[in-house]
Amino acid sequence: MTTTPTTRNARQAKILEILDRTRVTSQVQLSELLLDEGIDITQATLSRDLDELGAKKVKRDGGRSFYVVGGELEQFEDQLNGPREKLRRMLDELVVSHDFSGNIAMLRTPAGAAQYLASFIDRVGLPDVVGCIAGDDTIFVLAREGLGGRELAEKLTSRGI
């Protein structure tokens, strides 16, 4: 497996993606999962990334502890509020800027995070959104008829969803 250099933002987006889909119980396990994705990382850098992302270890039902981003409280909120609250947090964490044109809202993310966020926006099924197209760091979100790109961008970035 060859590794490729990545930016800090792209690496952290990949860490968020892995922690979202896998119960990671150690930094060694996370490092191996990142290596499988082509990202070679030192323990010091991984530890710093986890700290910057606010990752915490939690233990559920007497089992092994595992990493989550945002802690047990956010997981509890996810169970109560469902995917929209998770989307709000993801938008807060991943959108670095936004713009609009016509009925399209454009969201800019760190490198490597756009497809992950666009996929989640599509899965949530927001009534104002027809669908998303994503590149590496840019998402075009198509608004339904009657809603402009400006209004959609404001809804997505101001927790109005």
UniProtKB/Swiss-Prot annotation:
GO biological process annotation, one example: L-arginine biosynthetic process
NCBIfam families linked to this entry: PRK03341.1
Residue ranges the record marks as coiled coil: none
This protein's name: Arginine repressor
Organism of origin: Corynebacterium aurimucosum (strain ATCC 700975 / DSM 44827 / CIP 107346 / CN-1)
Record Pfam families: Arg_repressor (PF01316), Arg_repressor_C (PF02863)
InterPro entries: Arg_repress, Arg_repress_C, Arg_repress_C_sf, Arg_repress_DNA-bd, WH-like_DNA-bd_sf, WH_DNA-bd_sf
Native organism taxonomy: Bacteria, Bacillati, Actinomycetota, Actinomycetes, Mycobacteriales
Keywords carried by this UniProt record: Amino-acid biosynthesis, Arginine biosynthesis, Cytoplasm, DNA-binding, Repressor, Transcription, Transcription regulation
Family: Belongs to the ArgR family.
Biological pathway: Amino-acid biosynthesis; L-arginine biosynthesis [regulation]
